[in-house]
Every structure is written in C-alpha cells, then in structure tokens.
Curated annotation (Swiss-Prot):
Pfam hit, one: DnaJ
Name this protein carries in UniProt: Chaperone protein DnaJ
Residues given in the record as Zn(2+) 1 binding sites: C145, C148, C198, C201
Residues annotated for Zn(2+) 2 binding in this entry: C162, C165, C184, C187
Biological process, per Gene Ontology: chaperone cofactor-dependent protein refolding; DNA replication; protein refolding; response to heat
Protein species of origin: Histophilus somni (strain 129Pt)
CXXCXGXG motif repeat start-end pairs: 145-152, 162-169, 184-191, 198-205
Required cofactor names: Zn(2+)
Entry keyword set: Chaperone, Cytoplasm, DNA replication, Metal-binding, Repeat, Stress response, Zinc, Zinc-finger
Domain J stretches: 5-70
Coiled coil, from the record: none
Gene: dnaJ
Family under the similarity heading: Belongs to the DnaJ family.
Length: 373
C-alpha cells in the first residue's frame, strides 16, 4: 500500500511555513492522542502517521530531501541508505505545550537525546561509481569521553539528581490552561549534579575526536545517492546513542562518457569516407575496447546502441549509446582538393546520392515560391 503524502496527512500546502506545520500538527495530535482515544486502533494508526509526517516536515534538511525524492528518500537499501531514526523534531516541547498535566501529568523522565546525524560529501570517478569501491574518509565528531565513559564525572565522584528538575532534565511551568516544558536551566538537560566534573571532558561526557572510517560504495551509485552509516554520527548526551553518518555521493564529470540513469552516451568521430563506404571503428566501453561496424551511407547524428554496455545497478544493465560525428578533413593539399571537386561534380544533380541536400533545397524552393504568391 502506497504511503500518503506528508503534507496531505497534516492538511497543509507544500509551501506551508514552519508555524503552519507546527499548528496543524498540534491540532491533529490533540485530536488523535492515545490518552484521548483510549484504545481506538484507527486513531492510534493516525497518530503514528501524523508523528511520522511531522518528523520529516519539521526538519529543514529532511523536508528538502522529501520535496525532492518523496518517500524514497527515507527508504533503506540499494545505493542510498534511508533515514532511520530521526532526531530533528522536538516532540517534548510540543506535547508539553499541548498536554502538560492534563493527562496524568507531573511525571517526567530524563530524556535520552540521540546524537546528531552528520553529513560527509565524497567525490568519486565514474569508473568507481560503476564498479563500486572502498574509500577512506576522515571526520571530526563528538565521541563519548574515554576517561569518564560518557558520565561526565571523575572516578569516585558523586553524581546526584539535579535538585531543580529532580533528574528529569526538563522543568514545567503552568501557563493558564497549559503547561510548558523546557530544558532545566541548572543542569542544562543532563538531570545530574556532578560533584567533581571529569578533567578530560569538563563534565560534558563527550569530546571532539578525528575518526578514520572506510566507506564501502556499492556499484551503480550516482550523484545525490546517500549511504547511511548507522551509529557513526555524533555521540549523544548523557551516554545516549550516537547519530548516523550520511555519505553523499558526487560523481566527477567524465572526459568521454555522459550518464543518464543507467545509460551512457558518447560521441564517435569517423571520417567522411568511412561514413560513405562503411568500415570498422574502435569504441571505448567500461569493459575495454570494442570494435563496431559502421554501415555504408551513415549520416552524422546516427545513434548506435550497444545493449548491456552501460551501467549495472540493482540487477539492471543500461546501454551505451554512441552518436556518430562525421569529421570534415582540414589542411588539404591541392591534389586532395581537386579530387574532392571532381567528386562533387560527379554528384551534381543526383538527388538519390545526396538525400539530405536535395530535401533541403526542395524545401528552400517551396519557401521562396510561397513568399512570391
């Protein structure tokens, strides 16, 4: 079953701004929240669908990906890794605003904030894209502190619950009928009070580190494809899991081939004598050189399709399409020029031997005849 459009789910136009999207989400989430619908399966499914749509549309980068590629941008498998596990939308703030203590509030747990997703752009050659390759990359990211193992405290130091938020990392404030939830200003969301902060990370639990990674690039990738390396993003706060690393592929321009999907295109120059008489020409392919017969009376612009000689991706092999370009000889000596003049004279008036020229001249004659009427 095809997934519904995210904008349709929230009932907003594609050009809606962030405020409109948030407003629509609040209204629908209030309507279908499980605490209100009490076991209604259909409402639960709608609530999940609403959350999924908001996760994407509330994040600028993910929304841009969705606008360009639709649901395919977040599907796993194939050349581009899908988005799995979003961290862009802050549902805690929204639900704090909407529900607060209305549905048995007052209970608050410390949030586990997954680390940020990271992006790395990599440039590869067409040959590497076609056959697949391994690339060594270097990224600077946040990792859990090796001294305190992410706790933020020196060995033997006391770690107590924050007296302000009581370990929740969030504080709530009553505003008329609603309750707002915000990051605790004293512990900055950690929910902890550390007696003696770690000397390495200064109580943060994370440190910056340069990491060397090897990325396996599958065969058939193209510019814009993304590879998802799960858990290779920034480390989360308070020992929370790391985000993901997205490697974005950029294929360099090739000096011979142009790519369109799985098909490759190239120009093949031949002499005008070969075009007239036929012959054999050597064509470059991704598998090596290939000899191809040029039929007699070939015109410039003719396309030769070599099936299966393009790019193979996901089990499908594209074609190599060669466009014939007839070259005009230059720097002729007098003897050569005279031979060409004799050839030209021998073809004068013989329309069957000059199909393009005769057709053009007939068209010009008709054009001027019509002007004179």
């Amino acid at each position: 079953m095809a997934k519904r459009d995210y904008y349709e789910i929230l009932g907003v136009q594609k050009g809606a701004d962030d405020k409109e999207i948030k407003r629509a989400y609040k209204r629908l989430a209030m309507k279908y929240h499980p605490d209100r619908t009490k076991g209604d399966k259909e409402s639960e499914e709608k609530f999940k669908e609403i959350n999924e749509a908001y996760e994407v549309l509330a994040d600028k980068e993910k929304r841009a990906m969705y606008d360009q590629y639709g649901h395919a941008a977040f599907e796993q498998g194939g050349g581009a890794g899908g988005f799995g596990g979003f961290s862009g939308a802050d549902f805690g703030d929204i639900f704090g605003d909407m529900f607060g203590d209305i549905f048995g509030g007052g209970r608050s747990r410390q949030r586990v904030v997954r680390g940020e997703d990271l992006r790395y752009d990599i440039e590869i050659s067409l040959e590497e894209a076609v056959k697949g390759c391994k690339k060594d990359i270097q990224i600077n990211t946040l990792v859990h502190c090796g001294t305190c193992h992410g706790s933020g405290a020196e060995a033997g130091s006391k770690i107590e619950s924050c007296p302000t938020c009581h370990g929740a990392g969030r504080v709530r404030r009553q505003q008329s009928f609603f309750v707002t939830e915000q990051t605790c200003p004293h512990c900055h969301g950690t929910g902890k009070k550390i007696e003696k902060p770690c000397h390495t990370c200064h109580g943060e639990g994370r440190v910056h580190k340069t990491q060397n990674l090897t990325v396996t690039i599958p065969m058939g990738v193209d510019t814009g494809n993304q590879l998802r390396l799960a858990g290779k993003g920034a480390a989360g706060e308070n020992g929370a899991p790391a985000g993901d690393l997205y490697v974005v592929i950029h294929v360099k321009k090739h000096h011979i081939f142009e790519r369109d999907g799985n098909n490759l295109y190239c120009e093949v120059p031949i002499s005008f004598t070969m075009a007239a008489l036929g012959g054999e020409v050597e064509i470059p392919t991704l598998d090596g050189r290939l000899k191809v017969k040029i039929p007699a009376e070939t015109q410039t612009g003719k396309l030769l399709r070599l099936r299966g000689k393009g790019i193979t991706s996901r089990g499908y092999a594209g074609d190599l399409i060669c466009e014939i370009v007839i070259e005009t000889p230059i720097k002729l000596n007098e003897e050569q020029k005279e031979l060409l003049r004799k050839l030209e004279e021998s073809l004068e008036g013989k329309t069957l031997q000059r199909p393009k020229s005769s057709g053009f001249l007939d068209g010009v004659k008709k054009f001027f005849d019509n002007l004179g009427k």
